């Protein structure tokens, strides 16, 4: 027996989310059906607004309101302009920022190199990073804080090779993060130790 088309489409939509399999998608679809009309409308409005009202900062790539571009961190002149922390996504930036121990700038790649998925240097924010570094001589250190995964490691080494000839110091997070650990899943103490104990590449 098949579900009605509307439910089947809802299940299919949920199953496109990362980490959501068919069973979880079905559970979410039926949970949604049990929500009040107002809650469903608010949920739909929030989804729509997340696409229509948000953009990526034109300087660093962080997710921001279209009314706040550049983002609040890039616009904050009190930040340490000599350091740029490179992360994979906006969640990772928030995780680092919430340690309250880093006060420099950021650059969000919005992805990592992944030949298996057909994602090369031109598909993530690498060119904008190199341009940013060449345009801002005050930058003295680039901290690379990517996940401890095969793709994260490959991207880290690729960036280091690109940046080092400019004379800018390139460092990476200390190995407090075990292999396979996502930056945004690490606790604040571990992240603080990883940032403070960073090593030069």
Curated annotation (Swiss-Prot):
Gene Ontology biological-process annotations: DNA recombination; DNA repair
GO MF, one annotated term: zinc ion binding
Keywords: DNA damage, DNA recombination, DNA repair, Metal-binding, Zinc, Zinc-finger
Disulfide-linked positions: none
InterPro entries recorded: DNA_Rcmb_RecR (IPR000093), Rcmb_RecR (IPR023627), TOPRIM_dom (IPR006171), TOPRIM_RecR (IPR034137)
Zinc finger residue ranges, C4-type: 57-74
Entry-linked Gene3D superfamilies: 3.40.1360.10, 6.10.250.240, RecR Domain 1
All copies of domain Toprim, residue ranges: 82-178
Xref: Pfam families: RecR_C (PF21175), RecR_HhH (PF21176), Toprim_4 (PF13662)
Biological role: May play a role in DNA repair. It seems to be involved in an RecBC-independent recombinational process of DNA repair. It may act with RecF and RecO.
Family (UniProt): Belongs to the RecR family.
Name of the protein: Recombination protein RecR
Species: Oenococcus oeni (strain ATCC BAA-331 / PSU-1)
Gene (name only): recR
